[in-house]
Amino acid sequence: MSRLSIHPEGSTNATSPAEPLLESDDPAVIKVELAKRGIAFQRWPAKVKLDQNSSESDILAAYAVEIARVQADGRYPTVDAIRITPDHPDREALRQKFLDEHTHAEDEVRFFVEGCGLFCLHIGAEVLQVLCEQNDCINVPAGTRHWFDMGSKPQFCAVRFFDNPEGWIANFTGDAIAERFAKLP
């Protein structure tokens, strides 16, 4: 189930965050709270059951209608699919790469068609932890400080939309704030 926790960024303890200001697993509450902070959150039906051996092109073909809908306005000409499983040979390196706080020059749009991942958004004096699961689509605007955790045994597949042909390019902030917040097991 999708979940939102909102924490103040500060804490009297250097190794853990302050108690959450809000916690909810209600998609309507999640959508409203994120929208107040400029983050789009929608629930889309992940209608297609993918085979574990589905290729990237199979995944993109299965969600061609949804992809076309997002790409219709021309903002996101580049799309790919990422699938990380517990036996993925690069899972640890990929997890580490996403765990440090960073920004992007473009929006980060993800539609989860399987599994889950934890987006942590550092907005103003708050950190919003958004557990995205199957059927969730999140749009993190360009310049938003954030990090992403897929867990030590990741299991997710997401369609990713980009407004540049290079795809995922991070600008790391150097802030160690992510170390104070819970990660997925």
From Swiss-Prot:
PANTHER family: ACIREDUCTONE DIOXYGENASE (PTHR23418:SF0). Pfam families: ARD. Binds 1 Fe(2+) cation per monomer. The lineage of its organism: Bacteria, Bacillati, Cyanobacteriota, Cyanophyceae, Synechococcales. This is Acireductone dioxygenase. Catalyzes 2 different reactions between oxygen and the acireductone 1,2-dihydroxy-3-keto-5-methylthiopentene (DHK-MTPene) depending upon the metal bound in the active site. Fe-containing acireductone dioxygenase (Fe-ARD) produces formate and 2-keto-4-methylthiobutyrate (KMTB), the alpha-ketoacid precursor of methionine in the methionine recycle pathway. Ni-containing acireductone dioxygenase (Ni-ARD) produces methylthiopropionate, carbon monoxide and formate, and does not lie on the methionine recycle pathway. The record marks 101 as: May play a role in metal incorporation in vivo. InterPro entries: ARD (IPR004313), ARD_bac (IPR023956), RmlC-like_jellyroll (IPR014710), RmlC_Cupin_sf (IPR011051). Monomer. It comes from Prochlorococcus marinus (strain MIT 9313). The record marks 110 as: Important to generate the dianion. The keyword rRNA processing does not apply. Its EC number is 1.13.11.54, 1.13.11.53. GO terms for molecular function: acireductone dioxygenase (Ni2+-requiring) activity; acireductone dioxygenase [iron(II)-requiring] activity; iron ion binding; nickel cation binding.
